[in-house]
Amino acid sequence: MNSILERIAKHKLEEVAVAKKNKPLHVLSKQQPGEIRDFITALKSNTSPAVIAEIKKASPSKGLIRKDFNVAEIAKIYTQNGARCLSVLTDIEFFQGHPDYLALAKSKTTLPVLRKDFIIDSYQIYESLVLGADCILLIVALLDDVQLMDFCQLAQELKMSVLVESHTQDELERALRLPTPLIGINNRSLHNFKTDIQLSIQLKQFVPKDKIIITESGINTREDIKLMQSHGINAFLIGESLMRADNIGKALQKLMTD
């Protein structure tokens, strides 16, 4: 049986082919991007946990996560309650996201915004810029080394930051070859969706000190954050635990303060 990641990649190729027909690259690239915000500096400033708060309606492994899903309202709440950056799921088929959600969230916040999607074609990088992304996600498991370098350099030429995500030591080594300081360690396997937050602690030893480690998936409690901070990890991408909360603002504050 194909892994979830393989199914997503196959569908994404079809999706991008349709997008290119509907709006060819020469048309897309003429659209004027808006203001680009500094994602990297936002994660560096001060000593409190640097939370990238995620706007996510559903996932392939968990199904519907938040029924009452108002992108504009969630973006405002995250902004008012101490998030450093936002992450917005734009995948339609598997995560019930939408590219329009990114543009909407960006219009409701002063924070930098990450486009969380499965990038397999340079077209999506130009699209991300037009939608208002300040940072894109590149997933090592999805791309070869040439694609990773080309996509990373293209995004940076367009003035966006790049978060490169790995799940294994081998993937991490490939990620570290790229000219970006943002190193994501996904504690959840994109092949079987099993989660283990110890993975970030295990892989941290291989990451140079000039990089910013972002631990992703499975960070659900204040104790999880304190554990990571005790091992020198201070940036967190958090979605599901916030999206499941009745009071999103309080849930975010609770993660960040004793």
UniProtKB/Swiss-Prot annotation:
It comes from the Bacteria. It catalyses: 1-(2-carboxyphenylamino)-1-deoxy-D-ribulose 5-phosphate + H(+) = (1S,2R)-1-C-(indol-3-yl)glycerol 3-phosphate + CO2 + H2O. It holds the Pfam family IGPS. Signal peptide: none annotated. InterPro entries: Aldolase_TIM, Indole-3-glycerol_P_synth, Indole-3-glycerol_P_synth_dom, Indole-3-GlycerolPSynthase_CS, RibuloseP-bd_barrel. One of its GO terms (molecular function) is indole-3-glycerol-phosphate synthase activity. One of its GO terms (biological process) is L-tryptophan biosynthetic process. It is an enzyme of class 4 (lyase). Pathway: Amino-acid biosynthesis; L-tryptophan biosynthesis; L-tryptophan from chorismate: step 4/5. Keywords: Amino-acid biosynthesis, Aromatic amino acid biosynthesis, Decarboxylase, Lyase, Tryptophan biosynthesis. Its EC number is 4.1.1.48. Transmembrane segments: none annotated. HAMAP family: IGPS_B. NCBIfam families: PRK00278.1-6 (NF001373), PRK00278.2-4 (NF001377). PANTHER family: INDOLE-3-GLYCEROL-PHOSPHATE SYNTHASE, TRYPTOPHAN BIOSYNTHESIS PROTEIN. Belongs to the TrpC family. This is Indole-3-glycerol phosphate synthase. It comes from Legionella pneumophila (strain Corby).
